[in-house]
């Protein structure tokens, strides 16, 4: 009975003062976000990440993101690009599981070319416009390429430097 009385008072007040009571539709203007993980899969990770903590961390992060406006991708590299996924929606459980399986299948081997991995990730991020972009590098160190390879450490480091400058210009 008390609730009905309060409800009637509210209705009467709304009728007496209609200009004071109104509803406004609030539109959320969240900026979409693309996150790309650049994952070092070189042989040194076998000893420096024995428990595969870096990969587990990325998988755990994937589990925590369920928003439609956040897209996640990755680039797995050593001295070549091993696998990648351009940023994509993981709002559905199936999408999250598929991405986690891809990341879980990554193996550690060979040498390290950080410039190559970051450059590839930068290309994947640059493709999408009107999106906030975030790049996360997971590595145990520096570029490590043996002498006599067609690509030198200096070339890799120059490419890395160029990518960092591009990322700064693009707000990544």
How would you name each of these model-derived features?
Residues 1-5:
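Positively charged n-region of N-terminal signal peptides that target proteins for export
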Residues 27-89, 114-121, 134-139:
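Von Willebrand factor
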Residues 8-16:
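Bacterial N-terminal signal peptides
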Residues 85-87, 128, 146-149:
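Short, well-ordered secondary-structure micro-motifs
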Residues 43, 59-70, 104-108, 122-130, ...:
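Sec-exported extracytoplasmic/periplasmic mature domains
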Residues 52, 59-62, 92, 96, ...:
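Extracytoplasmic, non-cytosolic globular domains
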